[in-house]
Amino acid sequence: TSVTGVQTCALPISKVYSVLGMLDAKNPLIQTRPFRSPHHTISATALAGGGQTLRPGEISMAHRGVLFLDELPEFHRDTLEVLRQPLEDGVVSISRVQGSVRYPSQFMLVCAMNPCKCGWYGDPSGRCKCKQSGIDKYLGKVSGPLLDRVDIIVEVPAVKFEALSRNDTDEPT
């Protein structure tokens, strides 16, 4: 019998959720890879983990799955910076007066962001009225060292609904 990737991940994923007391007694193993999408107002502690009980944070809850950060520049910069070491090492290290813990953090980071504060920069309609200094400030909220740890960056232009809903049979599938 072969073991699928999800089956080999079930125990490490379940261990993190066990520490949090989030396992179901009837189904003690999590059989799906996690997808975590914290709000941009999340604190650095909630993202990385810690607090009085040294709990795992969203980063470790995404272990062997996806951590999706929508509206990336809207996150506090200090919150984003806690991603750097876990992305590099695959582990979150937390040290407090109560002690030290290490939680696994091998996750795929997926981020989304607008090209400027209004979201229209580069759109052919010319709807963006942002000044270059505002665009630079907005994009500058994400540090270079964090972006260095992002393997693929893709610009996706807006596509009108009509273009998506057309029934073009001329295009190859």
Predicted regions and their residues:
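Conserved catalytic/switch belt of AAA+ P-loop NTPases
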Residues: 81-101
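A short beta-strand-to-loop transition that corresponds to the Sensor-1 phosphate-sensing loop
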Residues: 70-72, 97-98, 111-116, 133-134, ...
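AAA+/SF3 P-loop NTPase mechanochemical coupling elements
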Residues: 35-36, 55, 59-64, 94-114, ...
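Flexible active-site lid/hinge loop adjacent to a nucleotide/diphosphate
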Residues: 130-144
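P-loop NTPase nucleotide-binding/switch module
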Residues: 10-60
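Conserved AAA+/SF3 P-loop NTPase catalytic/coupling segment centered on the Walker-B
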Residues: 38-43, 55-88, 120-124, 143-147, ...
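Short gly/ser/thr-rich secondary-structure transition/capping motifs
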Residues: 48-53, 90-95, 133-137
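Single conserved hydrophobic/aromatic residue that forms the stacking wall/gate
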Residues: 1-9
